Amino acid sequence: MITHKFEHPLNEKTRIYLRVESLLRQLHLSSAFSDAQQYQLFFRSIFDLIEIFEQIQLKSELAKDIEKQRVTYKSWLDVEGVDQEMLTSLLNDISHIYRELMQAERFGQSLKEDRFLSAIRQRFNLPGGSCCFDLPALHYWLHLPLDKRVRDAETWMDSLQPLYEALTLWLKLTRETGHFKDQIARTGFFQSDADEANILRLSIPMQYGAYPMISGHKNRFAIKFMSFETGQACTQDIEFELAICS
């Protein structure tokens, strides 16, 4: 059975985390500059990240969440039935990533101070603003040898490595708290309690031709399935899998 998967955040902080994860993924995928257009995705991802960093103290928020996870997992030490070797290894990983995070610069600081990035950032977001007459510095950079451009990209991405590792860990551990369970949306509608959840994960069979519209918060949520063909609410029962992740 072919399915499609959705994730939905149940609070604003997690919403930002998922956006940053998506931007970091785009950044890594486009950093090889294997075709002439990848640089647009690469720089747009960098500038979108800088904008997020300017709006929220992401480093301090993420540090608090990583520490909260460490305290939770530490409480499982010496608990019967828990793999203590695996738990100790995980706690060591969390502690290492937390230390690296706390020692890192404010997210995006070196990117904002980079002369080349600063020179192209403002005009890059203009419609069609990446033309050579709008951004001659970018046009010159694009004609540098590929290995030079890749080295520059690696330098910019290296400054985000503590963020990447910490965010990847937090989201991984958060997702692992939820287990997919079979559910039925009667006449295309489903609602339930969430109990301090951060993320909903859905797996939906493609055969229904439907996608979810989700609303809610950390304690309660509702899912309304919409027909892709008509844009109207589904009236049929829809079987799907749901994981509620805390």
From Swiss-Prot:
BP-aspect Gene Ontology terms: division septum assembly; FtsZ-dependent cytokinesis
Keywords from the UniProt entry: Cell cycle, Cell division, Cytoplasm, Septation
A Pfam family hit: ZapD
Gene3D superfamilies named in the record: YacF-like, YacF-like domains
Keyword Cytoplasm: yes
GO cellular component, one term: cell division site
UniProt cross-references to SUPFAM superfamilies, sorted A to Z: YacF-like
UniProt KW Cell cycle keyword: yes
Annotated compartments: Cytoplasm
Subunit note: Interacts with FtsZ.
HAMAP family in UniProt: ZapD
Database matches in NCBIfam families: PRK05287.1-3
Stated role: Cell division factor that enhances FtsZ-ring assembly. Directly interacts with FtsZ and promotes bundling of FtsZ protofilaments, with a reduction in FtsZ GTPase activity.
Family under the similarity heading: Belongs to the ZapD family.
Annotated protein name in UniProt: Cell division protein ZapD
